[in-house]
Structures are given as structure tokens and as C-alpha cells.
Design a protein with these regions (language model features):
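N-terminal and secondary-structure boundary signal
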Residues: 1-137
Length: 137
């Protein structure tokens, strides 16, 4: 496995959406992901309200989608999850993700709704140090 890459770029309010494409290029997105597979966009909703330092912002989401599409990633889906501190529907609405996803035809799925996806049991093939002791089933 290749080492992780971190890309940092100076931006401005006028260029921030476009700058995401350059960030994705610098980080090696095209080499790390397979255009023939469905690409899951996992937004971060730490709280229902907009907290730019804690949540995905609409401009991050739009810049990422634009970059993915420009690089040939056309099978995109945004997946929301449920936590003890978030209500995904409210976070999606309050953080203004819906208009961005609709603009680019990216469907929303919820990993806790049976109609959206099912969970498959994963059995690690390697010996685990402690994970199997913490999560026994």
C-alpha cells in the first residue's frame, strides 16, 4: 500500500470550489480510486448546525464532486450515517447539502435505513491485537 498524501493549497473565497480539483490532483485521487467502481462521498456532520470547522461545508462538497466528475468518476453516492449527536436529515438540510447533491445528480443514501443498504458481516483474515476483544460479535 502506498503512503498517504496530504495536500495543502492556499485558496480564496473566489477560487475555493475550483481549488478542490487541484487538491485532489495533488493528493493523487486518480491513482488511489477506481473510476469503474461506485465512489462513496461521506460527508461529516458532527452537529446538525453549520460549524465550518467541524462539518463538511457546501463548498467542500461541491468542489469534491466537481473534481471527481472531471476525473471520470461518474458513479457517485453520498452516504449519511447516524450517531448519538446527529440527526442526518437535519444535518443534511441545515448544512445545505441537498442543493449541491441535486445539482450534480448525486443520490443520498443512509447507512442505517434497510431500504438503502444492508450490512455484511466482516471476518478479519489476520490476527487482531484487540479489535476482536472489543467487538466480540
Amino acid at each position: 500500500m502506498d503512503k498517504s498524501k496530504v495536500a495543502v493549497l492556499r485558496t480564496t473565497p473566489q477560487t475555493v470550489v475550483e481549488d478542490y480539483h487541484r487538491l485532489c490532483q495533488l493528493a493523487g485521487m486518480r491513482q488511489a480510486l477506481d473510476t469503474s467502481k461506485t465512489t462513496i462521498i461521506k460527508d461529516n456532520i458532527s452537529w446538525h448546525l453549520l460549524y465550518p470547522g467541524a462539518n463538511t461545508t457546501p463548498w467542500q462538497l461541491e468542489g469534491t464532486i466537481q473534481s471527481l466528475k472531471a476525473e471520470g468518476f461518474n458513479d457517485l453516492v453520498c452516504v449519511h450515517n447516524k450517531t448519538v449527536v446527529t440527526i442526518a436529515d437535519l444535518g443534511d438540510r441545515y448544512n445545505k447539502f441537498g442543493p449541491v447533491l441535486n445539482k450534480y445528480g448525486v443520490p443520498k443514501k443512509y447507512n442505517y435505513k434497510p431500504e438503502d443498504m444492508t450490512w455484511v458481516r466482516y471476518q478479519p483474515k489476520a490476527k487482531m491485537l484487540v479489535l476482536d476483544k472489543i467487538f466480540r460479535d
